[in-house]
């Protein structure tokens, strides 16, 4: 029987589900899944949303406004809802909501939300590609689009201030250096480490730094922004 080609619908939203397993909990005694693993799940769902909309290869450009509102226990079903908020010439601003539920109850409640920006790339040249414009169709979509657009100026102002700073080793601030080996499974078909994997590494290093300084167990509650 010959294969039949079916055109994929260009939808502005994607929902992926994951099962939170014991191996997703970073250290013994933690109340739930590590923040880095949650960010990895978000990156996968947001990538699926971006690739579906643009119909091409995409790369993570920015992740920010990350709010962790509660821990996700091992054994929960995790649902990541990603949708286009607005588009630029080659960029797609995607809002993401993470919810989880005890499978015995099936009641999903929010655990995290954040914004991810992807850029569409030509898989052959690596240059950015134009994407279809997203036009909000109702009041809620317009509200989300306006909120996403309002953050652009703030991000640029922060980046400008950071570029003007001079960073040296003359500091008493606590610091820690972690090294990771990028495995073949960490690399996407474009030849680069997945953005979600890089975010998981950042979370692990941050966790080690805060626990060493405080002498207590710590959890991620907020991340202002990660630019790739």
Regions found by a protein language model. Give the residues of each.
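Catalytic strand-loop segment that frames the active site of acyl-thioester-processing enzymes
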Residues: 1-33, 145, 149-201, 208-215
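HotDog/MaoC-like acyl-thioester-processing domains
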Residues: 3-5, 9-17, 72-77, 85-158, ...
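Hydrophobic beta-strand-centered segment that forms part of the acyl-chain substrate-binding groove
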Residues: 9-11, 46-92, 109-114, 204-228
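Generic secondary-structure boundary/loop-capping signal
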Residues: 22-23, 60-65, 69, 128-131, ...
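N-terminal, Lys/Arg-enriched amphipathic/low-complexity engagement segments
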Residues: 29-33, 38-44, 51
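Short amphipathic alpha-helical face segments that pack within enzyme cores
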Residues: 37-41, 45, 197-201, 205
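Short alpha-helical basic/polar micro-motif
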Residues: 40, 76, 80, 124, ...
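Conserved GNAT-family N-acetyltransferase fold
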Residues: 42, 66, 96
């Amino acid at each position: 029987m010959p294969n039949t080609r079916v055109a994929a619908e260009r939808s502005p939203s994607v929902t992926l589900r994951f099962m939170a397993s014991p191996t997703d909990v970073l250290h013994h005694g933690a109340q739930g899944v590590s923040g880095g693993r949650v960010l990895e799940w978000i990156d996968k769902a947001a990538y699926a949303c971006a690739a579906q909309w643009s119909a091409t290869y995409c790369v993570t450009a920015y992740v920010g406004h990350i709010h962790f509102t509660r821990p996700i226990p091992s054994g929960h079903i995790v649902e990541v809802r990603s949708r286009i908020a607005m588009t630029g010439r080659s960029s797609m601003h995607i809002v993401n909501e993470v919810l989880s539920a005890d499978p015995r109850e099936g009641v999903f409640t929010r655990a995290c939300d954040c914004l991810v920006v992807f850029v569409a790339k030509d898989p052959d040249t690596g240059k950015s590609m134009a994407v279809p414009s997203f036009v909000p169709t109702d009041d809620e979509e317009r509200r989300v689009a306006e909120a996403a657009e309002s953050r652009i100026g703030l991000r640029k102002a922060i980046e400008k201030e950071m570029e003007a700073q001079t960073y040296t080793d003359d500091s008493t601030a606590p610091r820690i250096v972690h090294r990771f080996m990028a495995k073949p499974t960490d690399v996407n078909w474009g030849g680069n480490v997945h953005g979600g994997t890089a975010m998981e590494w950042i979370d692990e290093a941050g966790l080690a730094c805060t626990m060493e300084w405080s002498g207590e167990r710590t959890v991620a509650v907020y991340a202002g922004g990660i630019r790739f």
